[in-house]
């Protein structure tokens, strides 16, 4: 008996429960200390991947592998169901399972960890058990059939710590393991493939199985507690399995377990939807029985046997049961009633809904049929309701201990004993410490916040993509941009708010985890108490055994037996109540499984959406890189064009400098010529003075001659004295000498005049040459200007096209254009003011020239009038010449020649004055034209520089706008998506939360009812507390071991994740190295590594960084707006430059006209010079005639003197004296007239000289004014150059700021990428963590007292977070 009890305790050493039993197995291999017999063939891997919207898990089971250590689920193995007689092994050939090829999951294994457990082949099984459908799963007992021979000893079960294996993500669970051998002589084990989430009666079933084992060993035939759905069906079904020679144990007859097995249609439909999917994530096929030494119990929580999913397999099992029933003796009435009930249930189970569901399960997709042709006959249904109801072959140790104590020395039936044990165990859960209800709510809130963050991120991505599309087509209007900015700000605020909530909930979760640890500590204390109670039970057993050994039936013993019978009755009643409650719980669990199936579909869709978003993100990044390459190429082309324009401008500046040097040289030459002309004018004035002096002397001689004549007249009248005659002769000689001297002086003056005329002709030749050279230079300059203007026009046209293209792309930059236009308007106003001043100056010069022309015309009229008068005088003199003699004629000719010479001189002077004026005006016009051209060239250079700067800034702005727009659009898309997701998930979570609250209320009511019943079992609880304490100590040790293993696994997973992150970063770095220089990329990689380390250490700085990023984004947006305005202003400047070019063309045409007028003036001046030369020749001829007249007059004087002498010698007045006197008077009158004419000519000459002086003064004033204006223009040019230099410096500064902003944007993008990776990591961690609070209520119930969970379920919950990483 002690062997049996301790064997049971060894079998029960594994803490079991009614949830998913998960264990680490690496510790056993590492330590090399196996803890008992184990069967690696029956270990299964479990991968729980939480990717649902509300964090609900779905399950993927993978078969184990001997090679690798992993997490797994230890699932119950079945023993053969044989009768006690020594019968031969059954014929398994007809039901042997064929080895099947590997059936892989649909999900790719590249994304998930490798399955360390290869799928194994199924051993041939005599009874095909499969997973029961959720509507057909009812409480059933575990069959512990005896061996083929009753004499064989019962082997101990596998030790408490079975070696478990890590689950693979989506590897097949249906691959056959051909390596394992098959033994027909021994029992075979069927590999368990069911992990059901429904609750079952594991404790009672295990107790029944142990009692049946003991009764079989003793030769009795107790009822075997086989409670599968097929065994509960009718035993009167046609006996098809007799043909195959199968023998099974008969179903146990229980009258007290009437359970409703009607299927739930709504749950069935959901499960049907879930199971038709092509992706196989559920349990494997049927179990195969192994040898008893290799047998290992599953860890399901209800210990149910597996079911076939088809009706035929159920009929086969029923037939096996009938065969066993025919071989056994009839059992009591309760068993018969149970058979009747199972028949009714079998009839109900084969309803239309169940058949449709089974038929649908048999219909697989075409792809899976092709993959699984070999295993199509044995393929079983896989559902996500597999995490519960897995239990080892023996039930929990407390139940077995209580059952063994009650069974010792009792004569009651086994059912009553089991009912009493169940009642005792149901009274115990009040000792447990239950955690608060806030854990589930906090977990759900945390999941909700995480989903909201993910949804916001997705919406931001969507919005960024939409904005990218809009940007490629056309720039969006300003209103849309503002609206998007407002939405972005709102989404940022919502993100910050959600993050705050996330942090808050995280803190609350940490507090709740601490509370959970306290609860676990309380649970461990309860377990220690249970162990002490077990010790007490063992002591009581020993006492009973001693009493039995003594023999006899004492009255104490009878009293104890009666008490035990009463306790058994109470236990039976409590078991019935508990069965009803478990049925309700199973129904709710089925509904939960259906919801899990729907969640699985949503998770798959979510994965697809994530893959699609990743692909789209990669495409967007590639497009971004292409756009960046195009922009860089455009920048290079613009820089080359800019350099060309700079070269052209420099060449123009050089040519301008050369032309300015030439103009300065010409001006110096002109000033020298002017000075020479002035010197010549002074010499002419001196000559005129000398001439006046000679004329005065002539007047004096004439006066003397008149005195002589008067004296002659006196002599004629009176007596002529010889002394007076002698004196007269002396006087005449003296006069003649004076005349000779005057003639000599006159010749000298004429020679001087000729010399001056030669110098003037030479000067005129030089002036003509200078004028012709100046004309050639002006023509050359005009041609150069025209060619440069054409080149500038072409360049401006190209720039205009480029600016139009840029304007099409940057229509949104309006404000900056307005500012630029204002500056352009100011410059235009200044130019208009300058133009007005220049026009006023030009108009003043024109007025002055008109005044000078009028004066010259008046002078010409005066000269004409004087010339006409002289002509008249000449006509008169010619009329008088006929009366006069040859002397007279000679004198008249001399006088005419002198007049002509005077006229020629006047004309020459007037021509020279006109030439001087024209040359002065021409020089002034040239200076003005040169100044205008310089101003225009300077303006064009400044405008070119501005255009170049504007183009550079436009290119930079394009890049910045493209980056900013893409970032904003991606963020807005992600925000919108996240908002939508969060709204949907929030509604779903509210519904789930309401349902869970309802379930909690219902559970509370049931708990209150159980607490009322607990009072009846207080006495028995005192005895069992010690045993519970011992058990809690053991579970505490196991939990600590599990926690250490969890920490090791977490460290491993973190290392793997870090390695994966490093690999991803290296790949991204390699992709960027192809685009940029290797040096930059290395620095950026180092920065990224440092940033990652800082981000991992400093979590709290993320929010501050995001705020700074938002502020930077706002500042960048403001900069972008200002740059848009500048771009608009620059485009307007381009238009203004085009208008200015047109104006300059018109001005060039005007200048051409002015040059033509100047050439006409030059031609006129040449004609005037020729006329002056002719007049000079005429004056020379006149001078010669005057000299001839002088000679003739001298001869006449000599003749007169001779006559006077002859007259004096004769001393008699002759007749000719009167005639001579008359002639003398006429000559004197003529001389007087000539003197008058000379006086008038001198006055006119003096007036002309005064006018010349005034004109020279005016010319000098004008020259000074022109120089002043030139200096002012030079100052303006220097100021403009300074402004241009300042503008260039400002542009360089802006370029530096732009580069800095680009660097900051790139750094911000890197930070955002790091944040995204960090958020993903946090999401993964949060997906691992929320499972614990979701199951806190489950942990609160003590599975070792018959509740839904036990310490093993705690380990499963602790390892689920790590299993996520393996599946991911």
Curated annotation (Swiss-Prot):
Molecular function terms, GO-annotated? actin binding; microtubule binding
Q: Where is this motif: ZIM?
A: 41-55
Question: What residue spans carry the Basic and acidic residues bias annotation?
Answer: 290-312, 1320-1338
Keyword DNA damage assigned to the entry: answer is no
Provide the residue span(s) of the region labelled Interaction with myosin.
377-1368
Q: Where is this region: Interaction with F-actin?
A: 101-294
Enumerate the residue ranges of region (Interaction with TJP2/ZO2).
150-295
Coiled-coil region: 436-1330
Going by the UniProt record, its keywords in alphabetical order are: Cell junction, Coiled coil, Tight junction
Q: What is its main location?
A: other
This protein's source sits in the domain of life called: Eukaryota
Q: Is Coiled coil given among the entry's keywords?
A: yes
Pfam families assigned: Myosin_tail_1 (PF01576)
Positions of the UniProt region annotated as Disordered: 71-264, 278-312, 1053-1080, 1163-1183, 1308-1368
Indicate, by first and last residue, each region the UniProt record lists as having compositional bias (Polar residues).
83-97, 228-256, 1352-1368
Q: Where in the cell is it found?
A: Cell junction, Tight junction
- Region of interest: Head: 9-435
Assigned GO CC terms: bicellular tight junction; myosin complex
Please give the record's comment on domains: Deletion of the TJP1/ZO1 interaction motif (ZIM) decreases but does not abolish colocalization with TJP1/ZO1.
What family is reported?
Belongs to the cingulin family.
This molecule's function is given as:
Probably plays a role in the formation and regulation of the tight junction (TJ) paracellular permeability barrier, possibly by linking ZO proteins to the actomyosin cytoskeleton.
Name-wise, this protein is Cingulin
Q: Which organism is it from?
A: Xenopus laevis
Write the lineage as a comma-separated list.
Eukaryota, Metazoa, Chordata, Craniata, Vertebrata
